[in-house]
């Protein structure tokens, strides 16, 4: 009897311990609910930013602010890494995120998005500061949702309105140069859309592409010698080299219409601007829906900026003698 009683007591103790262990389990690490994220109610989000410049910095800041507000300061942690525009570094960063089994990856710009897509099919990936997800991910029959572990926000401003802006501010333009980095697929996509608008209006154009920052000076010099105006789409390489572009275009009196505010503030006359901070914040809201509310990322359509604003660069407009009509906001000097 005593032996049976002792055995029963030991068995009860073992079962109680096992149940307690199950109750404190951190789950499978998928990040599908706040209770099992990171084993302590905390989500870990890996952020890979392609390079440093104002637009991408603002998107990262907006994303983090949204996550902190929605999840709570103590419930989300960030591992923020900058790839400095290098493919090898980008791969290393993303692979480290995958090895660490982060709950979600924010891919800030096209290169991190493409790299993350190749690295994992399980961890949710949100892109931001990406123009066209279809071309970036090689999806031919693009419908707005990827059908896989990827979604995000697009920074594409209406191309037709950008072309209208160029014709409004530079009505005498007969030949327009399209300046972008040939290594950035999103830039090529925008260039093709812009060219179609120019063709429809009977305006001739010529492409000027740089493979990297080392070629920007020479191709920009060629552009100002052959064109009346220049269009630069959202392009990370160009955004990091606006001083070089401005030092050539401004003395040549060739106005630049820019695809985003960061480029415009450095070398442009005007832009149809989105707020990259707001775009990042919007992406943070998507992260909350995925991690905290269990929304299926595969069926989430890529979102665009809620609003766009006409903005101009007062200093460059004055230098070129361009009068800005009503309806434009001045870009504040830094």
Regions found by a protein language model. Give the residues of each.
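Bacterial lipoprotein signal-peptidase II cleavage site
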Residues: 20-40
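An alpha-beta-alpha
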Residues: 45, 63, 151-198, 296, ...
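Beta-alpha junction/loop-to-helix N-cap segments that form part of ligand/metal-binding clefts
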Residues: 79-141, 232-259
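Pocket-lining segment of extracytoplasmic ligand-binding domains
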Residues: 185-254, 260
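Flexible loop/turn connectors
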Residues: 263-315
